Amino acid sequence: MARFELQKLYIDGAYSDAGSDATFEAINPANGEVLAHVQRATKEDVERAVVSAEKGQKIWAAMTAMERSRILRRAVDILRERNDELAALETLDTGKAFSETKYVDIVTGADVLEYYAGLVPAIEGEQIPLRDTSFVYTRREPLGVVAGIGAWNYPIQIALWKSAPALAAGNAMIFKPSEVTSLTTLKLAEIYTEAGVPNGVFNVLTGSGREVGTWLTEHPRIEKISFTGGTDTGKKVMASASASSLKDVTMELGGKSPLIICDDADLDRAADTAMMANFYSSGQVCTNGTRVFVPSHLKAAFEAKIVERVARIRVGNPEDENTNFGPLVSFPHMESVLGYIAKGKEEGARVLCGGERLTDGEFAKGAFVAPTVFTDCTDDMTIVREEIFGPVMAILSYETEEEVIRRANDTDFGLAAGIVTRDLNRAHRVIHQLEAGICWINAWGESDAKMPVGGYKQSGVGRENGISSLNNFTRIKSVQVELGDYVSVF
């Protein structure tokens, strides 16, 4: 017996049965409990959602900027009023510690929505003089119907990061959450409707990326895809979107980010930064700094500080607010992470701590993996080359600044990077040479609503958050006005 009732699709401002009886299970990864049975959208459901979105978008775009802004601000208020309720549901569905979801997931998502709600009246064009009798003006117009495809690690936050600029610009969005974590996105759809967003402007289709995601990327009347997920899937999304109708695509993809500890760094601060860059959200953050570069002569001292801090991690029931490290998001993902850990051991990396599944007591029912630190790693090891998306830190030693910059950039990814140093001249000098779209100096992980985020190389296309994301959900129309006589050459 599932804890919650059957989860339906959300189309045209209300819950709606899918076109088939097929469902999948939402599983609590802390104990294997079936939380809910979730309906799988069909291709016909995708078409229904598009028709609904087209209708709603016309109503939404016709509203004044202040009207749209006020409605989105009401949604912000509702999100904040229901913060704890939504955070508790997110914890059940993802396994993330309530101490995290309560203070981060809904809070930061609401901040992004508030930011874009404030920018709605600021969407403006330009006036360009040509001569005394003629000028050009530009308009920023909504794209129309767009689609968002989310990842499983920050379900409601990602849904808000994508829907906030889209709706602020006057678009309608069809959102497909990850099949692994679908529950809070459906609640977000309810909140948008309650706040006054017209029916159809935010529809939610649940199901697999292979089916529902593909139908969305291929649909000829969807103008843009905003995708968060793995690099391999992102390549397929881009190919599908361009083949069907030359859709605009924004993608936030994988990473294998470097964290460089300099020889002048405060080692306590360096260790604290490395812990946040590797074990926050049980290591399931795309920007994690999993390649930690440490000067050779400081490696032993740094390792000791890391081991000390790992011992203080409070692994446990994620619903307990004292817990700060929960299970991985699913049992299949746990097996993937354990496979990488086994590979690290096989290839000669030394386990400093962790390195196994936790099975004592209540842990046996869940997808718990011990916080794991490998040292004596080399650049060619699988755990150093590939994104693990779990609580696995790899410590690498280096000798010179030139060397560490070269090695930090020796990756197909380019999502994030960081440096810990007391010398700000060095910090900027190194950061400016790192091939990464998001960089931190003496910190790790904060992504404010005003901060554009996205990757270099195979870590993404385009940016989310900041003013640039709002502009990316509009298209520019140029209009020339002639006030004088018009003379034909014919």
From Swiss-Prot:
Record flagged with keyword Oxidoreductase: yes
Top EC category: oxidoreductase
Gene of this entry: betB
Residues binding K(+) 2: L246, K457, G460
Described purpose of this protein according to its UniProt entry: Involved in the biosynthesis of the osmoprotectant glycine betaine. Catalyzes the irreversible oxidation of betaine aldehyde to the corresponding acid.
EC number(s) given by UniProt: 1.2.1.8
Keyword annotations: Metal-binding, NAD, NADP, Oxidation, Oxidoreductase, Potassium
InterPro entries, per database record: Ald_DH/histidinol_DH (IPR016161), Ald_DH_C (IPR016163), Ald_DH_CS_CYS (IPR016160), Ald_DH_CS_GLU (IPR029510), Ald_DH_N (IPR016162), Aldehyde_DH_dom (IPR015590), BADH (IPR011264)
Subunit field text: Dimer of dimers.
Gene3D superfamilies (alphabetical): Aldehyde Dehydrogenase, Chain A, domain 1 (3.40.605.10), Aldehyde Dehydrogenase, Chain A, domain 2 (3.40.309.10)
Active site residues per record: K162, E252, C286, E464
Record's cofactor remark: Binds 2 potassium ions per subunit.
Domain of life: Bacteria
Source organism per UniProt: Pseudomonas fluorescens (strain Pf0-1)
Annotated protein name in UniProt: Betaine aldehyde dehydrogenase
Site (Seems to be a necessary countercharge to the potassium cations): D248
Pathway: Amine and polyamine biosynthesis; betaine biosynthesis via choline pathway; betaine from betaine aldehyde: step 1/1
Catalytic activity: betaine aldehyde + NAD(+) + H2O = glycine betaine + NADH + 2 H(+)
Cofactor field: K(+)
MF terms (GO), sorted A to Z: betaine-aldehyde dehydrogenase (NAD+) activity; metal ion binding
Residues the record lists as Cysteine sulfenic acid (-SOH) modifications: C286
Residues binding NAD(+), per UniProt: G150, A151, W152, K176, P177, S178, E179, G230, T231, D232, T233, G254, C286, E387
Residues holding K(+) 1: I27, D93, V180
